[in-house]
Amino acid sequence: MMGIAADNISDGNNISNLSFVKFNKLYSEKYNTTLDPNLGFVGFAEGDGYLGINEKIPVFVLTQKESKILYEIRDTLNFGYVKEFDNFSRFIVRDKLSILLLFHLFNGNLHLKHKINQLVESILLNSKNDNNLSIITEPVKLSFNNSFSGFTDAEGCFNVYISKNNKGISLRFIVDQQDGLSLFNQLKDILDSGSIYARKNNNYRFAVTNINKLVLVIDYFNAYVLRSKKQFAFEKKVIYNCVLNKEHKTLKGMEKLKELSYLVNKDND
């Protein structure tokens, strides 16, 4: 059984880049190939995944309404399985070697303290230390890469709000996360824009509504493509240019924007 001693925990100071060297070394030994972990899975897993203990063994569970992306993850990683329920599906990993692979994939590459704590607790609850693992407990600094794209697939959305009098329109990029204050402060610094809202149960929301700052969000997702159906919402980004050109000031333009807003909001469910 995989385990770790408490003194094998590192604070990993000044971490700013994702690292997958140990993961790819172990992965290549098992599958005779390497995998590009920058596919966004780490961010997606950090947003919606759970690593814990079930029946005294570590288990990783990723829950999603959209089963298609879970099957893509399974086929890309070459391990785990997908179980479908009535209104959602789960990607599940239980075997020892695959959990070890996930450990190296996540270790030092997570942004949220409570997700790092899951990693610590799930490993520390195992009595042996067969693999001599060291856990990095310092959150990695946020940077714009595929990991944040995956995180947005899990926890973000694009939203269009049209006022009741049909005269005003607001475009929003939103990300929600429990214990997300530190992460969202970094995101606000990177974008030099956005607002952070405290919600119930230590949940936080980050939102960008400034039309001039949204171009930075658009540029990012042009470079790092979303893998969920939220990509379909993003592809309606022509609405941004319509608002920038004040097309909503005309009756014809507002009707066009209403149609686009329906499509954007629909693909964020």
Give the location of each predicted region:
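Internal intein/HINT superfamily modules and their associated LAGLIDADG
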Residues: M1-D269
